């Protein structure tokens, strides 16, 4: 028994050794094939070739496009997808190529879209205005051509348009109504045009899928090159914004007022341009959590503030060095936005209605009476001013120059009609608007007048002082004459 057991044990060991050797051979073969493939597959050679091909195709007009030229795109799409699957390639080195190739892919998608419109407009001319999206347009064409649509299969067509083409119910309704009038169902396409349409649909869908794959790849690595933008709006939206602009530096140059419209769908004739929130530019940024988690009433204000902060974050990321993931400013800006959004969404505080204050019993202002009339006389125009404001009919007004060199009209203040209107009558003059003098000032003025009179009398100008009495003049003469001189004078002439 022991010999049989030993024999079976030796067989098991031998079989195990053979299996292990076969596994090792298979692994070595796989490694050699992978090494051969990596040696042949160089992404930094394929990417410039793909960029050059996409650039040349983008310059061709849709009328002159041929399928032999578009057929070269498919192998390049396969190579680009292989590059995206390799994780060992440095993302920083690949990013400049992706920034250059993303706009070219978009232009090629637009080229294929226009090519499809030029081919299919003979059969359904209104379709391009009803379905503006290139991907939905190609899917609708494939549904209409492959499903053999007839009037009895309207339910089946509705199902395919909703699930495969991802159309809304409003779009489907408008499309079915337009098909009854402008869709030429009885005029099928020829074989050549049909094959061109199918191949163009395939290329357009592959380009669209490649664009989405590149966007997802950049979203997975976006925190390396744009940490602040990624922190504010999330990796997916940050990747869409940067991919649309073509790089972080290009995105930082876009003004904040234009960021909201990036990724916005074209307006359709049957759709409303604004929703309840009042926002017209519903692009990539409008779908971020910083806007959607708050009430609809503050969406418009939050979108404007978020665009400003995203623009600042992009400039910060563009100025940082590679590998620097400093998000201090993004944390600060996000906290500010959250605080402002909470303040905007709060209900207004109910202010208590205050009662009117109790009226104070004060004496009312007087508008008449003797004192009030005397008070108003202070501000009344003088009689000369009133005459200056009047003009004599048929005569030229006399004017004088003031200190500033401007002419001032004298009116009737310097005419012979003063006498006629009573200019010199003292009874009509009012002293109400004259300056009021204090007792001290009156005393000082009277003393000054008295001194002036005495000085004039001493000079012999008594004739010009009619108010002085003769007694005062004789008294003043006696004070200022010398009696000795008088006696000498009489004695000398005696």
Swiss-Prot record:
Pfam families: Nop (PF01798), Prp31_C (PF09785). Residues 225-346 form the Nop domain. It is found in: Nucleus. Residues 88-122, 191-225 form a coiled coil. The record marks 257 as: Interaction with U4 snRNA. Residues 344-370 are annotated as: Disordered. One of its GO terms (cellular component) is mitochondrion. InterPro entries: Nop_C, Nop_dom, Nop_dom_sf, NOSIC, Prp31, Prp31_C. Keywords: Coiled coil, mRNA processing, mRNA splicing, Nucleus, Ribonucleoprotein, RNA-binding, Spliceosome. One of its GO terms (biological process) is spliceosomal tri-snRNP complex assembly. GO terms for molecular function: RNA binding. PROSITE patterns: NOP. Component of the U4/U6-U5 tri-snRNP complex composed of the U4, U6 and U5 snRNAs and at least PRP3, PRP4, PRP6, PRP8, PRP18, PRP31, PRP38, SNU13, SNU23, SNU66, SNU114, SPP381, SMB1, SMD1, SMD2, SMD3, SMX2, SMX3, LSM2, LSM3, LSM4, LSM5, LSM6, LSM7, LSM8, BRR2 and DIB1. Promotes the association of the U4/U6.U5 tri-snRNP particle with pre-spliceosomes to form the mature spliceosomal complex. Present with 1260 molecules/cell in log phase SD medium. Interacts with the snRNP via the Nop domain. Belongs to the PRP31 family. This is Pre-mRNA-processing factor 31. It comes from Saccharomyces cerevisiae (strain ATCC 204508 / S288c) (Baker's yeast). The gene is PRP31.
């Amino acid at each position: 028994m022991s010999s049989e057991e030993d024999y079976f044990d030796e067989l098991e060991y031998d079989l195990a050794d053979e299996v292990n050797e076969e596994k090792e051979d298979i692994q070595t073969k796989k490694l050699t094939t992978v090494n051969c493939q990596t040696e042949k597959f160089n992404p930094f050679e394929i990417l410039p070739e793909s960029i050059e091909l996409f650039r040349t195709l983008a310059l061709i007009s849709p009328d002159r496009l041929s399928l032999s030229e578009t057929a070269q795109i498919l192998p390049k799409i396969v190579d680009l997808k292989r590059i995206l699957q390799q994780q060992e390639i440095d993302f920083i080195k690949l990013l400049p190529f992706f920034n250059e190739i993303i706009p070219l892919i978009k232009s090629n998608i637009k080229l294929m879209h226009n090519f499809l419109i030029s081919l299919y407009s003979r059969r359904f001319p209104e379709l391009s205005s009803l379905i503006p999206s290139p991907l939905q347009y190609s899917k609708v064409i494939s549904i209409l051509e492959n499903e053999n649509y007839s009037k009895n299969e309207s339910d089946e067509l509705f199902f395919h348009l909703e699930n495969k083409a991802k159309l809304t119910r409003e779009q489907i309704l408008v499309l079915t109504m337009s098909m009854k009038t402008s869709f030429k169902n009885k005029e099928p396409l020829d074989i050549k045009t049909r094959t061109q349409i199918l191949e163009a649909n395939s290329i357009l869908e592959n380009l669209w899928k490649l664009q989405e794959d590149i966007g997802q790849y950049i979203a997975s690595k976006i925190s390396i090159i744009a940490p602040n933008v990624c922190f504010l709006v999330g990796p997916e939206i940050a990747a869409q914004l940067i991919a649309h602009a073509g790089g972080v530096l290009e995105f930082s140059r876009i003004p904040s007022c234009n960021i909201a419209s990036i990724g916005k769908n074209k307006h359709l004739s049957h759709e409303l341009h604004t929703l309840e929130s009042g926002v017209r530019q519903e692009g990539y940024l409008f779908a971020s959590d910083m806007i959607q988690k708050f009430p609809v009433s503050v969406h418009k204000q939050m979108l404007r503030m978020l665009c400003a902060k995203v623009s600042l974050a992009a400039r910060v990321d563009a100025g940082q060095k590679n590998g620097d993931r400093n998000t201090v400013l993004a944390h600060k800006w996000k906290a500010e936005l959250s605080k402002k959004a909470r303040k905007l969404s709060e209900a207004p505080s109910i202010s208590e209605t205050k009662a009117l204050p109790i009226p104070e019993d004060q004496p009312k202002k007087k508008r008449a009476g003797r004192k009030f009339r005397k008070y108003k006389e202070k501000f009344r125009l003088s009689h000369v001013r009133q005459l200056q404001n009047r003009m004599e009919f048929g005569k030229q007004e006399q004017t004088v120059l003031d200190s500033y060199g401007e002419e001032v009209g004298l009116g009737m203040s310097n005419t012979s009609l003063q006498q006629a209107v009573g200019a010199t009558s003292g009874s009509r003059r009012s002293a109400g608007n004259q300056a009021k003098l204090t007792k001290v000032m009156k005393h000082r003025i009277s003393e000054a007048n008295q001194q002036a009179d005495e000085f004039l009398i001493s000079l012999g100008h008594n004739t010009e002082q009619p108010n002085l009495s003769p007694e005062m003049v004789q008294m003043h003469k006696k004070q200022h004459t010398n009696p000795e001189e008088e006696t000498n004078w009489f004695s000398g002439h005696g």
